[in-house]
Swiss-Prot record:
InterPro entries: Kinase-like_dom_sf, NAF/FISL_domain, NAF_dom, Prot_kinase_dom, Protein_kinase_ATP_BS, Ser/Thr_kinase_AS. Residues 23-278 form the Protein kinase domain. SMART domains: S_TKc. Residues 164-193 are annotated as: Activation loop. One of its GO terms (molecular function) is protein serine/threonine kinase activity. ATP binds at residues 29-37, 52. Residues 341-370 are annotated as: PPI. It holds the Pfam family NAF. It is an enzyme of class 2 (transferase). This is CBL-interacting protein kinase 6. Its EC number is 2.7.11.1. Residues 308-332 form the NAF domain. Belongs to the protein kinase superfamily. CAMK Ser/Thr protein kinase family. SNF1 subfamily.
Length: 451
């Protein structure tokens, strides 16, 4: 997992890494933006746990330390059978460790992908547990704000567990008007009022997300599917969706009350639990999930490797990249203005491998003036071969993000060197090389640059 000898608080036991004398670290379960998750054994109790390892340097560099602190504070506040339990928090000079309940059935999202959609009685089982967890959070003044199938895990018995409170808010975060004002969430699941910048009720916003999850469980697709995020939110604000014909009458009556664009008239939890669909007795429970032993041979952990796919970018990170609040130029190939720093920010349907090939080609055609110093699914970094002027070598970073199926956003920015040289490089070399893969460029005969 880590360079144990160099990391304070870690040691060795029987060939495996031991964290602060308490947890014997096992295999890597998954990777995140700021670290990874390991299965581990609590040496005091013998139980298996999940240990989330967070690299402080990455968190600080991304300006996310407050989010990590908030996630820890919230998880200490909520203890519920359908919420992943936080056992312990530890820290060293360079890392934060969260010992969590080990939930081994995988994401609910994975089950939806495999099955296409879920039987109505199974969906009711999951949905009841979701609502129970969400209602408990609200009773403790906690609003999740990023509810989606990827943040819902299943245990071996098929029971649901809510995770990832990194975007959650506490009731005391509300302003004088009693509303929350932070833009956050995931495209397709965030309530339309969250984007209006006039404040929103965290509980009602969570219920909208629950409604989207219920729709996805029953229909096997999103109610507002659209690659263009702007169009997606317009559909959500109009309530522009259709319930599949195979849904029961009670389900077809419930979903519009959850996906009500008006938060004032949207159904509350108290009303929801009294609806016929919610109260109906399920015919059967979801079957248990057969899994391998929780703690397999604790192989020496490897250093974190970069994912082989672009990082997922949610709508609000996308807004933070855009100048102003208008996302449409990203999806329309609008080239008139360019970005203030002379760089590029554009959407494309080109796969990550194609974008990378174009960027590497720029360096190859430059006669050795630029070289590739980093290349992967998350982006490419080009650096000048010559020392450069007083500000050093020119360095250009192109980060690649996924915002929807088959849609990427590429953010090109200066990573070092002289600004005038950077602008010239973007204008004369980068932009012509990337022009025909910018969304909307193929249909527009005018030169296409970035937002």
């Amino acid at each position: 997992m880590m360079a144990a000898a160099a990391e304070e608080g870690e040691g060795k036991k029987g060939g495996g890494t031991v964290l602060q004398g308490r947890y014997e670290m096992g295999r890597v379960l998954g990777h995140g933006n700021f670290g990874r998750v390991h299965v581990a054994r609590d040496l005091r109790t013998g139980r298996s746990v999940a240990v989330k390892v967070v690299a402080k340097e990455k968190v600080v560099r991304a300006g996310m330390m407050e989010q990590i602190k908030r996630e820890i504070a919230v998880m200490k506040r909520v203890s519920h059978p359908n919420i992943v339990e936080l056992h312990e928090v530890m820290a060293t000079r360079s890392k934060i460790y969260l010992a969590l309940e080990l939930v081994r059935g995988g994401e609910l999202f994975g089950r939806i992908v495999r099955l296409g959609r879920v039987r109505e009685d199974a969906a009711r089982h999951y949905f009841r547990q979701l609502v129970s967890a969400v209602d408990f959070c609200h009773s403790r003044g906690v609003y999740h704000r990023d509810l989606k199938p990827e943040n819902l895990l299943l245990d071996e018995a098929g029971n649901l567990k809510v995770v990832d409170f990194g975007l959650s808010a506490l009731a005391d975060h509300a302003r004088a008007d009693g509303l929350l004002h932070t833009l956050c969430g995931t495209p397709g699941y965030a309530a339309p009022e969250v984007l209006r910048d006039k404040g929103y009720d965290g509980a009602k916003a969570d219920l909208w997300s629950c409604g989207v999850i219920l729709y996805v469980l029953l229909a096997g697709s999103l109610p507002f599917p659209d690659d263009n995020i702007v169009t997606l939110y317009r559909k959500a604000q109009r309530g522009d969706y259709r319930c599949p014909a195979w849904l029961s009458t009670d389900a077809r009556r419930l979903i519009p009350r959850l996906l009500d664009p008006n938060p004032t008239t949207r159904i509350s939890v108290a009303q929801l639990v009294e609806t016929p669909w919610f109260k109906k007795t399920s015919i059967s429970r979801p079957v248990s999930i057969e899994l391998p032993p929780a703690f397999a041979d604790p192989a020496p952990a490897k250093e974190e490797a970069e994912k082989d796919e672009p990082e997922t970018l949610n709508a609000f990170h996308l807004i933070s990249l855009s100048e102003g609040f208008d996302l449409s130029p990203l999806f329309e190939g609008d080239s008139a203005k360019g970005r203030r720093d002379g760089g590029m920010l554009f959407a494309t349907r080109e796969p990550a491998s194609g974008v990378i090939s174009r960027l590497e080609g720029v360096a190859a055609r430059g006669g050795g003036r630029m070289r590739v110093t980093k290349s992967g699914a998350r982006g490419v970094r080009l650096e000048g071969a010559e020392r450069g002027g007083a500000k050093g070598r020119l360095a250009v970073a192109a980060d690649i993000f996924s915002v929807a199926p088959s849609v990427l956003v590429v953010d090109v920015k200066k990573d070092g060197g002289d600004t005038l040289e950077y602008r010239s490089f973007c204008s004369e070399e980068l932009r012509p090389a990337l022009q025909d893969i910018v969304w909307g460029a193929a249909a527009d005969p005018t030169p296409t640059a970035a937002v």
